[in-house]
A protein has these predicted regions:
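RNase H-like (RuvC/DEDD) metal-dependent nuclease/polynucleotide-processing core
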Residues: 1-174
Length: 174
């Protein structure tokens, strides 16, 4: 992790330290300077617009980002280190993921999987994005996203998280 302000280049918070997810969460909850813009290198939700649902067919599935984060946290509550393997193996969620061992769920969408609007924009720009429903290989982006959703669920009352809190004003934001 690094911090910077308008006068300096980024500086590591604890140079040489290997942060655990729990340590990152603790620092963000307790030591984050006021009026800070926080950036995360992860996706904050899954594809929704294409099917008007994160998990089509899951009648009690989440209908928005905060509900998604809460669901991931609830299903994975017993996993240490903000892990999220339990969610990918959940009977209602598993059909939507490509998982290790050649297990591609029937609702993964084939190819590179279902895309959010941002992946569609990347493809139009000439990039080769992959779905965050992909949990295997070098192109997997979903594992970090799921862990990040647990982090966001726990931080949502600490500061505003764009876009799900777009209209709210806070001293800090992510």
């Amino acid at each position: 992790m690094a911090c910077c302000d308008e006068r300096r280049t980024p500086a590591l918070v604890r140079p040489g330290h290997r942060w655990s997810r729990g340590e990152v969460l603790h620092w963000l909850e307790n030591d984050l300077p006021d009026d800070t813009l926080v950036g995360f290198d992860m996706s904050m939700s899954f594809a929704f617009d294409d099917a008007k649902a994160y998990f089509p067919g899951w009648t009690e599935g989440p209908s928005g980002a905060r509900a998604l984060w809460a669901l991931v946290e609830t299903v994975c509550a017993d996993e240490p280190h903000l892990g999220a393997t339990t969610f990918a193996d959940h009977p209602q969620a598993a059909p939507h993921f490509r998982r290790h061992g050649g297990r591609e769920g029937a609702l993964f969408g084939g190819g590179r999987g279902r895309f959010r609007q941002t992946e569609h924009a990347q493809a139009r720009a000439g990039c080769r994005p992959y779905s965050n429903f992909n949990l295997v290989g070098a192109a997997q982006v979903g594992k970090g996203s799921l862990a990040g959703m647990r982090l966001l669920h726990r931080l949502q009352h600490r500061f505003a998280i764009w876009r799900s809190h777009a209209a709210e004003i806070s001293a800090s934001a992510a």
